[in-house]
Regions:
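N-terminal membrane-entry
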Residues: 216-235
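Intracellular coupling helices
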Residues: 239-267
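Mid-to-C-terminal secondary-structure elements
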Residues: 59-75, 88-220
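Glycine-rich loop motifs involved in handling phospho/adenylate chemistry
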Residues: 79-83
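Generic structural signal for small/hydrophobic residues in well-ordered secondary structure
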Residues: 8, 24, 34, 66, ...
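Acyl-group handling in specialized metabolite and lipid biosynthesis
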Residues: 9-12, 219
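Short amphipathic beta-strand/extended segments in non-transmembrane regions
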Residues: 6-7, 17-75
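Membrane-proximal juxtamembrane linkers immediately C-terminal to transmembrane helices
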Residues: 1-9, 29-30, 72, 130-132, ...
Length: 267
């Protein structure tokens, strides 16, 4: 699905209100499914299991998360992992920390004394992704227990959710950005009051080194990476030149030694 996933943001940032992806899903038949994801509200939550208490980073997502993203599932039914609003998927490393060698499936965890979730799956730790590594992945509905402005029907908080869309094969929304802007102008307060002006549809492949900033996803500095690459290439070139010079010098030295031996009558 990598080449069919996009995120919808604006000229300043990639985040949006939670309802945005659902609005677009209703409006555009090009969209196969949507998945709002929140990462910045789940940092350093207290997780309780029996007499254990650990600090964990949570990601809140729609039940469609594993239908969009291909993170490896180590235990559990991929198609039903987040089916229940109180389900949770734990990372392999966190499962080992909190459950040891016990089977995590069906175990109940408390989050910051406010709610309980049941483990339905174990996933491989997230690496090399725009989505930060999470100890727990829980349903997006659970975030409202800490922040009411992030409900599925409340567009008030425009700065914590990334609206991921999975487009149908062969479909493209980039040509519809003007239409999306007009729609947002009617329905979305940050456009209506001109806090932002431009809607952007950003392919997943362009997020890491893209021009649209995000405080909740992993991003890289393309310019810095190019500088490092250039430095690496220069070091390699100098190393090759030094090797060639050293080889030539050693060959010359051996030629002199052989000439000297011949003059002295050595064979």
């Amino acid at each position: 699905n990598y080449d069919r996933i996009v995120a919808v943001g604006n000229e300043d940032f990639l985040e949006s209100a939670v309802p945005v992806s659902y609005w677009l899903e209703e409006r555009y038949p090009e969209i196969e499914k949507v998945c709002p994801v929140i990462t910045d509200q789940g940092k350093s939550k207290q997780i309780f299991y029996g007499d254990k208490k650990l600090t964990a980073d949570l990601v809140y997502a729609d039940s469609t998360f594993f239908g969009l993203f291909s993170f490896k599932i180590l235990d559990g039914d991929r198609d039903r992992l987040l089916e229940d609003p109180y389900s949770a998927v734990v990372s392999e490393s966190f499962a080992r920390k909190i459950f040891g060698n016990d089977d995590p499936i069906g175990k109940s965890l408390r989050i910051s004394d406010s709610t309980s979730v049941m483990v339905t799956g174990v996933m491989e730790d997230i690496n090399r992704s725009v989505i930060p590594n999470a100890d727990l992945l829980v349903r997006i509905e659970r975030v409202t227990e800490f922040n009411q402005s992030l409900s599925k029907t409340n567009p008030g908080n425009a700065g914590s959710c990334v609206s991921f869309l999975l487009l149908k094969p062969g479909m493209d929304l980039k040509g519809r950005t003007d239409e999306i802007q007009s729609f947002f102008k009617e329905r979305y307060w940050i456009y209506r009051y001109d806090f932002v002006k431009e809607a952007r549809v950003v392919p997943l492949s362009d997020i890491y080194f893209g021009n649209t900033a995000s405080h909740s996803l992993n991003q890289g500095d393309k310019r810095f990476s190019l500088v490092l690459m250039s430095v690496g290439i220069l070091i390699l070139i100098f190393a090759i030149i030094n090797y060639i010079n050293l080889t030539v010098a050693q060959a010359g030295q051996r030629a002199k030694e052989m000439a000297t031996r011949r003059l002295l009558g050595s064979s």
